[in-house]
Regions:
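Cysteine-nucleophile active-site neighborhood
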Residues: 47-119
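Pocket-forming structural segment of enzyme catalytic cores
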Residues: 88-164
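N-terminal beta1-alpha1 ligand-phosphate binding loop
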Residues: 2-24, 184-186
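An anion/phosphate-binding loop that grips the pyrophosphate of nucleotide cofactors and donors
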Residues: 38
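Short, surface-exposed beta-strand/loop micro-motifs that present aromatic residues
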Residues: 167-173
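Acyltransferase
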Residues: 180-205
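Beta-strand-turn-beta hairpins that frame and shape the catalytic cleft
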Residues: 139, 173-178
Length: 205
């Protein structure tokens, strides 16, 4: 069972639907016991960084997320879910992130000919043998919707990058914690394969 953390953000049902498509059972929940008893946990979301942190704290889900990560349970952050795992964001200055991973969320720089938010398909450059990308081609195309991007403090945790106005850390992996700026649930067959790879973690070890 995969728990999808419900903190009032959008996009929860599309993640649930994608997991169903690959044959995985999931539950959308904010209940601590259901989350801690799940085999794996996903933190999805679209919206504003500060509002999301307020919601996580309101439901005490910030504490639950730290518990999950400390348990070495596989954890996946998607889009805003990636951003929340880091220290803070230009979008909501003065608001502390979850500090699960080290790095900052920065605004995508303005560049002539490019629209912000970045909405659409971009290819990834894979690196560091990320487990989410096992069996994928070298430059898979995935779907992005964002105005802010990750600059991780440690390049060793970065498993995929892309270019849009600047160099973007698009996916990271550290121990049991995985995160991607793009939306695997909206990324067609490549995205479903990424979710399959996440679902298989621990089953084949």
């Amino acid at each position: 069972m995969i728990a999808i953390i419900d903190y009032g953000a959008g996009n929860l049902r599309s993640v649930e639907k994608a997991l169903t498509a690959i044959g995985e059972e999931s539950i959308v929940t904010r209940d601590r016991h259901e989350i801690l008893n799940a085999d794996k946990v996903i933190l999805p979301g679209v919206g504003a960084f500060g509002d999301a942190m307020d919601s996580l704290k309101k439901y005490e889900l910030d504490k639950v997320i730290h518990e999950v990560c400390d348990m070495s349970k596989p954890f996946l952050g998607i889009c805003l879910g990636l951003q929340l795992l880091f220290e803070g964001s230009d979008e909501s200055q003065g608001v502390e992130g979850l500090h699960v991973l080290d790095g900052q969320i920065l605004r995508i720089p303005d560049k002539e000919g490019l629209k912000i938010p970045h909405i659409g398909w971009n290819s990834l450059d894979l690196q560091n043998n990320g487990r989410l990308f096992k069996g994928l081609s070298e430059h898979p195309y995935v779907y992005f919707v964002h105005s802010y991007y990750l600059k991780a403090a440690d390049e060793a945790i970065v498993t995929a990058t892309t270019e849009y106005s600047t160099h973007i850390h698009a996916s990271v992996e550290k121990n049991n914690v995985f995160a991607c700026q793009f939306h695997p649930e909206k990324s067609s067959r490549y995205g479903l394969k990424i979710l399959e790879n996440f679902a298989k973690i621990g089953r084949e070890d």
